[in-house]
Amino acid sequence: MTDKIINSGNLEAGYDSVIDKDSKYVMQTYGRQPLVLSKGKGAVVQDIYGKEYIDCVAGIAVNNVGHCHPTVVKAIQAQAEKLIHVSNLYYTEIQAEFAETLASITGMECVFFCNSGAEAVEAAMKLARVATGKSAFVAAEHSFHGRTIGALSVTHKSMYRDPFMPPVSSKTSFVPYSDADAIRKAISEDTAAVVLEPIQGEGGVNVPDPGYLKEVREICDETGTLLIFDEVQTGFGRTGTWFCKEQFGVEPDIMSMAKAIGGGFPMGAIAARSGLSFGRGQHASTFGGGPLACAAALASIQAIKEEKLLERSKEMGAYFTKKLSGMARDDIVEVRGKGLMIGVEIKYPCGKFVDFAREHGVLVNCTSDSVLRLVPPLVITKEQIDSVVDVLEQA
């Protein structure tokens, strides 16, 4: 591993102590792995005992510029010494600067800031409803857009939806992913928007057919329906371009973003085309576009540009995919994805891969039961990729 972490040598708590305290005081909403992490640098994280792991989870596609990128760290430190938080009742230079930057890289007209992906999807849905006066949505099977009540309305997986039915918008039609004709049939006079992930993440790293999103765009134009892209997981270089929409040459009306936007610092946003915007009082976020978040986001974008991480994502993604496809295994169904958003579909539930990899210094996660999702920091090296593939080949 090339990313070296300096170990302080002083253990504040053992695994059992941390896990016991978590079990006692934290609502158990996650099926956590038995791992207590304390540090990170680049594509490597370290546990409290000093053991290092190549991180192919990256906070679930959050740490695109790597853990604790020095440019991001310095920006947060500098901003924290000047201004941490003020109400959005007032202007700040750094928010205005980041809004301009985000509008530029998205190619869209205006933005709204929030704090997470689910909030961004909620804002996109709310904007679609207020802009059209309609209340129904069309979404894809196997979609994931968040677990808050509104976002849950367009999230397909029954284990997330069923305990909370009916959601805020019960008028959601779910259709097969990558089936444009099904979308055409599902759109009604009350459909405000079609909501899609350009590549489905939680659903199994599902890449649509090449012409699918263009056809959906045409259908939306013909029917006067808005098109929302959920780029929460696919954004900021993950697939080899700023946003996955560029891979398919399709522009949405509204786009939701989060995860990698702040270089690891919590932030979310939506961007909208000309003519789509909330009016005063129609939506708000106390912490949205806060000074620390904007400082982190500007620094993250700076790092992506200066270190040519878009190009690196393409290069390392192609290398990783080739290496994974060449593994001497007969239980692999398919290796798919774009850039450094890669899914490895296995013939059976892949939990054992996750456990074996962790025990051998590699972090991966399972999605859709039988798909290994690999979304490492874009700064991962070929040597680290080789190490990951060696471990997975043995699992």
Swiss-Prot record:
Cited CDD domains: OAT_like
Residues reported in the UniProt entry to bind pyridoxal 5'-phosphate: G117, A118, F144, D230, E231, V232, Q233, T286
Cell location: Cytoplasm
Annotated metabolic or biological route of this protein: Amino-acid biosynthesis; L-arginine biosynthesis; N(2)-acetyl-L-ornithine from L-glutamate: step 4/4
Cofactor note: Binds 1 pyridoxal phosphate per subunit.
Pfam family, one: Aminotran_3
One Gene Ontology cellular component annotation held by this UniProt entry: cytoplasm
GO molecular function: identical protein binding; N2-acetyl-L-ornithine:2-oxoglutarate 5-aminotransferase activity; pyridoxal phosphate binding
Record-listed E.C. numbers: 2.6.1.11
Binding positions (N(2)-acetyl-L-ornithine): R147, S285
Keyword Cytoplasm annotated: yes
NCBIfam families linked: argD, PRK01278.1, PRK03244.1
Quaternary structure and interacting proteins, as annotated: Homodimer.
Misc: May also have succinyldiaminopimelate aminotransferase activity, thus carrying out the corresponding step in lysine biosynthesis.
Protein name: Acetylornithine aminotransferase
Organism, scientific name: Methanosarcina mazei (strain ATCC BAA-159 / DSM 3647 / Goe1 / Go1 / JCM 11833 / OCM 88)
